[in-house]
């Protein structure tokens, strides 16, 4: 079966030109855990062929309930390596670069899209600020998916106007503290559901996966809008 057949259902909606735009698009994704891993898979399954994934974590047993790279067999392995192997089984012709490192404020190379799915407030803040400095690169970010049950409460909004999300609030507070703000508006995925506190930071796949798939849809819809 030729490779085009695998993406025929995507092309039915996006059209031949839309598929070509998706194949030519370059995306960098920071964080491949409970949100980012599902975003990566959704993009590759839709037809994206140029993806760079960045994460310095290894798979842990506590990841198995929600993270795509996590199985009993992959515990202890770098998440980006496991995910790259999986994505290449979906499309062996895809150019997938795996960077086993945490973001520490470095300058960013230009991509068409940057997706932020990291948890650290400091790293997330620095990434958003630096990413919005890169001309022509669209930036999408994930806010807090943990401590929630309801996938139907997942929505999107602009970072500075999101309410009821502790992570968005913490990011804005750090921006104010360091005196730096995004150079342009940043569209985010978040949940309107009130967080449910628990002793450990609980999270469920049905919510984190919807966050990830929403991020992927933001990329695809942006390409459609730009057409």
Name each model feature, range by range.
Residues 39-40, 83, 215:
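Hydrophobic residues within alpha-helices
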Residues 45-50, 133-136:
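Conserved S-adenosyl-L-methionine
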Residues 109-113, 118-126, 130, 139, ...:
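Glycine-rich phosphate/adenylate-binding loop
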């Amino acid at each position: 079966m030729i490779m085009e057949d695998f993406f025929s259902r995507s092309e039915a909606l996006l059209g031949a030109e839309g598929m070509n735009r998706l194949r030519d698009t370059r995306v960098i994704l920071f964080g491949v855990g409970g949100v980012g891993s599902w975003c990566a898979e959704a993009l590759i399954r839709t037809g994206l062929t140029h993806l760079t994934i960045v994460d310095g974590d290894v798979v842990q047993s506590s990841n198995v309930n929600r993270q795509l790279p996590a199985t009993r067999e992959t515990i202890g392995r770098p998440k980006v390596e496991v995910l790259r192997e999986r994505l290449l089984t979906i499309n062996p012709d895809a150019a997938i670069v795996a960077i086993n490192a945490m973001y520490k404020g470095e300058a960013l190379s230009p991509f068409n899209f940057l997706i932020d799915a990291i948890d650290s407030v400091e790293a997330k803040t620095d990434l958003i600020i630096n990413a919005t400095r890169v001309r022509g690169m669209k930036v999408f970010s994930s806010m807090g998916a943990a401590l929630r049950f309801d996938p139907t409460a997942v929505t999107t909004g602009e970072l500075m106007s999101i309410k009821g999300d502790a992570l968005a609030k913490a990011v804005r507070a750090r921006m104010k503290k360091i005196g730096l703000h995004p150079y342009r508006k940043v569209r985010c995925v978040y949940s309107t559901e009130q967080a449910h506190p628990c002793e450990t930071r609980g999270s469920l796949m049905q919510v984190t996966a919807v966050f990830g798939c929403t991020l992927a849809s933001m990329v695809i819809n942006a390409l459609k809008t730009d057409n």
